[in-house]
């Protein structure tokens, strides 16, 4: 059992985090991607002093175009608006995985700038590492005036449910001038004015190899770049703490690590890709041994954005959902005893051809973590991540919180036994062969660390 001293150490970490007081009326939950899209467009259209959009990517498709056009229109109507868009440097300059890079998002940003002379909408490319595989901009948030619209979603057709398919995420609007200022000022100082940052809407931008040294130094600087602010809330009231982190020892990682053992009754985790860092798996096992309940909601392998149906040409990236399922099966086989006693509940999300991208953590009725962090080794070590930790000691958000979780569970089925999941022998031939080949040369372990 967790000693009192150890539990106090975890609780002490949370108690010492600076917290900003939050009015319950200024926290809004959205439960569907189309609501998120409409809210984002409304906020952009009504902005009075700033629009700062941060996402992994802003895609050149119907959904992404609607957002970028709305930002241009807002700037045209109100030239005094402080407008900036930040996306990952590498992702913007390639096609989708497996597609040619002939007409990239960066090319589109340049065209939009040329088509709108006199309307300055800078699109900054943030290079978190020298190669995309080794780290991306996974910082999330849409800072508009005194509000932060927060979601793990990027901006394209499926995330915004622009057409028939959607990718399910979490969506929250937090109106809090202090938090919006803290996040905006950090982005301005460390990203917009960081070394190695260049505008993607400029066709004369440098090539990645030309800024390689700047990127390396920038990454080092990001490791130490935290949000600095004075808290104004105590531990007995509704409060928010914005967090940012890059690298294994970041404050964000430490907070996630300390948050889990503070569970008195139940921990709920959402992640789209079941590939938890070992340190978090150990936390879960300790909670189960201490008699606590743990619920994990993950996407079915067919609801993974990398899943390729058997009737389509197979690409290597299509093996990923199977690798995640292998991880989950192995995890459950170790902990089947707790599944049998209903202490551990694992749910698989699947809704027709739609995909699942939810991430986050709920500890009892007291703590909620809003984050884009996938709780995997990549998020733990390689990507620039952030989060908003909500402390709700008086359960003022209980109704919205319960509704959100009930809706997340709607399209899920409970895994009653690890054998309910397919084993490698059940996989399509091409997947089976590839996984066995990867295992022979032990590269599956490397893959699990970077994907």
Predicted segments — roles?
Residues 188-189, 283-286:
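Short, solvent-exposed amphipathic alpha-helical segments in soluble enzyme
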Residues 274-276, 301-304, 376:
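Short, catalytically relevant binding-site loops at active-site mouths
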Residues 10, 15-45, 61-263, 302-359, ...:
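HKD-type phospholipase D/PLD-like phosphodiesterase module
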């Amino acid at each position: 059992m967790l000693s009192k001293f150890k539990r106090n150490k975890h609780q002490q970490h949370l108690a010492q985090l600076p917290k900003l007081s939050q009015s319950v009326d200024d926290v809004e939950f959205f439960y569907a991607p189309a609501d998120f899209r409409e809210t984002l467009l409304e906020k952009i259209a009504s902005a009075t002093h700033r629009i700062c959009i941060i996402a992994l990517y802003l895609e050149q498709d119907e959904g992404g175009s609607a957002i970028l056009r709305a930002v241009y229109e807002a700037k045209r109507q109100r030239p005094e608006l402080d407008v900036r868009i930040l996306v990952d440097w590498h992702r913007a300059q390639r096609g989708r995985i497996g597609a040619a890079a002939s007409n990239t998002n960066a090319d589109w940003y340049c065209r939009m700038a040329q088509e709108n002379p006199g309307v300055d909408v800078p699109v900054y490319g943030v290079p978190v590492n020298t190669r995309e595989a080794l780290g991306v901009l996974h910082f999330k948030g849409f800072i508009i005036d005194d509000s932060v619209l927060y979601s793990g979603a990027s901006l394209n057709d499926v995330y915004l449910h622009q057409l028939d398919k959607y990718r399910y995420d979490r969506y929250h609007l937090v109106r809090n001038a202090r938090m919006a200022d803290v996040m905006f000022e950090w982005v301005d100082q460390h990203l917009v004015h960081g070394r190695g940052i260049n505008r993607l809407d400029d066709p004369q931008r440098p090539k990645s190899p030309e800024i390689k040294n700047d990127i390396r130094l920038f990454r080092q600087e990001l490791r130490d770049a935290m949000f600095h602010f004075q808290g104004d809330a105590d531990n007995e009231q509704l409060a928010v703490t914005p967090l940012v982190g890059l690298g294994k020892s970041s404050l964000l990682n430490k907070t996630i690590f300390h948050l889990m053992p503070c569970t008195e009754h139940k921990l709920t985790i959402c992640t789209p890709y079941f590939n938890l860092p070992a340190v978090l798996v150990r936390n879960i096992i300790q909670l189960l041994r201490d008699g606590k309940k743990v619920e994990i909601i993950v996407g079915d392998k067919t609801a993974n954005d990398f899943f390729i149906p058997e009737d389509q040409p197979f690409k290597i990236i299509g093996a990923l959902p199977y690798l995640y399922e292998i991880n989950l099966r192995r995890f459950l086989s170790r902990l089947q005893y707790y599944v049998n006693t209903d202490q551990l509940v694992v749910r698989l999300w699947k809704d027709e051809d739609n995909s699942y991208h939810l991430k986050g953590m709920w500890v009892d009725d007291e703590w909620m973590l809003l984050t884009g962090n996938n709780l995997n080794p990549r998020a733990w070590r390689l990507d620039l991540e952030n989060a908003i930790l909500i402390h709700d000691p008086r359960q003022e958000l209980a109704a919205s919180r319960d509704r959100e979780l009930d809706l997340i569970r709607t399209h899920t089925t409970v895994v009653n036994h690890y054998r309910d999941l397919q084993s490698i022998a059940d996989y399509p031939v091409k997947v089976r062969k590839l996984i066995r080949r990867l295992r022979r040369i032990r590269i599956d372990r490397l893959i699990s660390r970077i994907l």
